[in-house]
Amino acid sequence: MKVLEAGHAVVTDLGRYEGPALGFSVNGALDQESAKLANILVGNAATEPLIEITASRVKVRLDRRAVIAVTGAPVEMHVEGQPCPALTPLGLPAGAEIAITLTGPGMRSYLAVHGSVEATALLGSVAPDSMIGFGTRLVAGLELPQLVEAPDLANPHLSVSLIHLGLRGPVVPAEPVIDVTDGPDREEFGTTAEKLFGAPFTIEPRSNHVGLRLTGAPPHREKPGEVLSRGVPVGAVEVPSDDQLLVLHRGRGVTAGYPVLAVLTTGALDVMAQVRPGQRVRFRRVSVAHARDEHRRRELALAHVRERVRIALVEHGLELPSHHGTDPVTAGAGSGSVTAPVDGHRSTNDVSVDPDADAPWG
């Protein structure tokens, strides 16, 4: 695959989970659910490398036949000048030129290729880390090797072959609601802690993959004294002394020294990945149990889509490897049991979930 127009895009995956124990940020796709879905739609494991496009336009040319899919923020996608839909597997010939332009709302979209693309890895992950200057950023002329050539999915009635799954794109509200659980320092804010859930907060331009700055009327810490630097989770809502909030995202350092008022849920982190500077958000307090059940529901919905995609792709001649036991989406999802960490907690309790109910894209 050759990059013709680069925009603001990188090769990434779900993150460097071996990194935090060694002092590295986890990084990875900021909208994890959209990244997982993109890989699922092309028959990959959810953990495979893919391209994250941030608020820009990217154009690439395929070197080999491929099955691709685009998810995340709404886009205009053209293949050889012909409009094509997102949220569905597309079978394309070698030499096809793909142009993807983010139209909004939303901030990030994901391009996955069946069999993935090759990029340099560190500690088992290709995720960029700006603090150490690691990662593959797209530039015009860059060649990204396609690891697999897909079979010919030619459709005699269409110039572009697609497998229609009827998935809907995520709805990005003008003022998203961000779910949070209580942070370890909530009691230090006394009665002012409730101010977090009152008026909205505005995303500042000085926001990136490390964290987002928000202005508004934040709570004020009532306990005097400094906070010693300690480990902080992805999603921590910190309250510094300058009347702003900091929401730490996947590029955050593993330690920090501000009080942590709240922690975003897994789903809320994906929502925050799609908000733009100047946009307003509102915080909503939820229990850890609610956050855990919501995470299971979303993972089961992804597993349901994976099974539909698997059947469709196999019928079209693709040979798909088994991902069970290694893929965070399929591992345990069939039984309704999810063992991946959820908002700092780990659980194997079953939960009754309708995988088609209120999935953000299905």
Task: Show the residue positions of the predicted features.
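Conserved "landmark" site that anchors the functional core of diverse proteins
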Residues: 1-362
